[in-house]
């Protein structure tokens, strides 16, 4: 494999970290895709949840693509790994799925924070700026949004409450 002419101040550990983050984002996308089509089933039938999780899946895939583009820009090499299967196939109620989604977003956020710490330890200001401007603020917003949804789903309860939340909150947003 040839060495990139574009490479400058790009540590091998940072390059490997970007590849791990690509995998993490693709795993999140894969998990959200599973959630989306669970809520699209005829025996679940919550189209707002389907739409919300499908949008989340697309967003995570876009994050992976952004990281791949960045890897190439810095002269790194993209090394894809196997994407782990989501932890489950059945996602339960909307509340349960949102709780899983919140944990997933917190895991992605922690991975990004670890990557930020790594690139900072190698004095890579460009990568730190990239992570801050493209990912970290968005993660905080996503965690807050999911937390709000969980609070409201607890408030309205399962059954009819969840159905109304699906119609009034999720179908009208994104």
From Swiss-Prot:
InterPro entries attached to this UniProt entry: Ferritin (IPR001519), Ferritin-like (IPR012347), Ferritin-like_diiron (IPR009040), Ferritin-like_SF (IPR009078), Ferritin_CS (IPR014034), Ferritin_DPS_dom (IPR008331)
Distribution of this protein across tissues and organs: Expressed in somatic tissues but not in oocytes.
UniProt cross-references to Pfam families, sorted A to Z: Ferritin (PF00210)
One of the record's GO molecular function terms: ferroxidase activity
SUPFAM superfamilies reported in the protein's UniProt record: Ferritin-like (SSF47240)
The reaction(s) this protein catalyses: 4 Fe(2+) + O2 + 4 H(+) = 4 Fe(3+) + 2 H2O
Gene Ontology BP term (one): iron ion transport
Signal peptide extent: none
Keywords for this protein: Cytoplasm, Iron, Iron storage, Metal-binding, Oxidoreductase
E.C. code: 1.16.3.1
Record-stated family: Belongs to the ferritin family.
Subunit structure: Oligomer of 12 or 24 subunits. The functional molecule is roughly spherical and contains a central cavity into which the polymeric mineral iron core is deposited.
Name by which UniProt lists this protein: Soma ferritin
Organism whose genome encodes this protein: Lymnaea stagnalis (Great pond snail)
């Amino acid at each position: 494999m040839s060495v990139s002419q574009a490479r400058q101040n790009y540590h091998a550990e940072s390059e490997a970290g970007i590849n791990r983050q690509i995998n993490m984002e693709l795993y999140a996308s894969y998990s959200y895709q599973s959630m989306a089509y669970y809520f699209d089933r005829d025996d679940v039938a919550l189209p707002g949840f389907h739409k919300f999780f499908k949008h989340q899946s697309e967003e995570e895939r876009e994050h992976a693509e952004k990281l791949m583009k960045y890897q190439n820009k810095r002269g790194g090499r993209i090394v894809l790994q196997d994407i782990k299967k989501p932890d489950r196939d059945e996602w339960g109620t909307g509340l349960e799925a949102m709780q899983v989604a919140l944990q997933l977003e917190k895991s992605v956020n922690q991975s990004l924070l670890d990557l930020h710490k790594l690139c900072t330890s190698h004095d890579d200001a460009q990568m730190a700026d990239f992570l801050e401007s493209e990912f970290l603020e968005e993660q905080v917003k996503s965690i807050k949004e999911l937390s709000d949804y969980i609070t409201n789903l607890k408030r309205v309860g399962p059954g009819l409450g969840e159905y109304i939340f699906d119609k009034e909150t999720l179908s009208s947003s994104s």
